[in-house]
């Protein structure tokens, strides 16, 4: 069975992330969403909270699995017998950075390629960073994030 992985910090997961997961789930029989610990980024939500928010956001997708990780992505890829890495790219800056990571991951995994998904037009400007900034300044992010994330932000 072809398995792909969509790694990220997902702090928080946005509707742009969810769109990429849904599109991947149509194409591939098994999609693993790997939520990175990333303590250096000083996340708004803990790893456990982010994993749970992603799980709640993809509950309608039967072929999607969600887990957290702190290891090197290449090691996670080997452990789960992954065929490809899914990455979202919004801008040329994203693409240049992701191209470098793709080459590095291909080297470290002995040939696992990265597949780049452009965003749906309505999510092209959305990022977790932008969502956090809007939220921290009292703005409304209801249209930018899945309902479980919006509810978690309201509860903070």
Curated annotation (Swiss-Prot):
* Enzyme Commission (EC) number: 2.7.7.3
User: Which EC class is this protein assigned?
Assistant: transferase
Show the Gene3D superfamilies listed in the entry.
HUPs
Q: Does the keyword Cell membrane apply?
A: no
Gene Ontology biological process terms in this record: coenzyme A biosynthetic process
A Pfam short name: CTP_transf_like
Keyword vocabulary terms for this entry? ATP-binding, Coenzyme A biosynthesis, Cytoplasm, Magnesium, Nucleotide-binding, Nucleotidyltransferase, Transferase
Where does this protein reside within or beyond the cell? Cytoplasm
Could you say which protein family the record assigns here? Belongs to the bacterial CoaD family.
Please identify the protein, giving its name as recorded.
Phosphopantetheine adenylyltransferase
Q: Which gene encodes it?
A: coaD
């Amino acid at each position: 069975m072809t398995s792909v992985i969509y790694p990220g910090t997902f702090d928080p997961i946005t509707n742009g992330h969810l769109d990429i997961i849904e599109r991947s789930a149509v194409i591939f029989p098994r999609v693993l969403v790997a939520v990175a610990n990333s303590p250096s980024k000083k996340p708004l939500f803990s790893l456990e909270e982010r994993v749970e928010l992603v799980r709640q956001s993809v509950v309608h997708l039967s072929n999607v699995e969600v887990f957290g990780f702190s290891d090197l992505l290449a090691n996670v890829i080997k452990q789960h017998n992954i065929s490809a890495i899914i990455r979202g790219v919004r801008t040329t800056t994203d693409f240049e950075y992701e191209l470098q990571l793709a080459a590095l991951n291909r080297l470290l995994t002995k040939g696992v390629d990265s597949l780049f998904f452009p965003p749906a037009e309505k999510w092209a400007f959305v990022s977790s960073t932008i969502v956090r900034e809007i939220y921290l300044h009292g703005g409304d992010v209801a249209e930018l994030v899945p309902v479980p994330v919006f509810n978690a932000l309201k509860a903070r």
